[in-house]
């Protein structure tokens, strides 16, 4: 598919640009965010494969509902920003902003578990070959989201110094 390389290049430029901005402001933050992202990924993968975390219908519902709430808050913040309005506290380095970022990191991490479950279910049910791409793309999107949220959390923590 022609769009895959284009997407990969654009995403690389996007993540590289954001990472460069954060790195220029907070030296060393990118390597910390990358290490934490992969640490979370591997810890949750181990917890999922050993069945320390089980994906039940209630677990799935809770994670999807929390993710939807975060999307709504970010959409309101984005649209409000276009008109000069701010959602107070969540983007600041105060205790509420850090708490919100921590909550978002946890929800992003729990979305990894849903991705693992989707992949495992697809394998068990003999899903068509093209579904591998959907599963891989979903996992990639979740990892990018987790990385960006960890980056924001670390920036807020460093901003308190």
Language-model-detected regions and their locations in the chain:
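A hydrophobic alpha-helical transmembrane-helix feature that marks the membrane cores
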Residues: 1-161
């Amino acid at each position: 598919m022609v769009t895959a390389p284009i997407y990969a290049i654009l995403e690389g430029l996007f993540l590289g640009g954001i990472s460069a901005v954060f790195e220029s402001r907070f030296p060393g933050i990118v390597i910390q965010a990358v290490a934490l992202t992969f640490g979370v990924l591997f810890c949750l993968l181990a917890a999922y494969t050993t069945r320390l975390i089980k994906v039940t219908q209630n677990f799935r519902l809770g994670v999807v509902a929390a993710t939807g709430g975060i999307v709504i808050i970010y959409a309101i913040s984005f649209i409000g920003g276009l008109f000069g309005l701010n959602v107070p506290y969540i983007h600041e380095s105060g205790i509420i902003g850090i708490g919100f970022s921590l909550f978002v990191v946890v929800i992003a991490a729990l979305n990894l578990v849903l991705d693992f479950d989707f992949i495992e279910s697809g394998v068990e049910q003999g899903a068509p070959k093209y579904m591998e791409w959907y599963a891989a793309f979903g996992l990639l999107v979740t990892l990018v989201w987790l990385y960006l949220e960890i980056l924001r959390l670390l920036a807020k923590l460093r901003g308190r110094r």
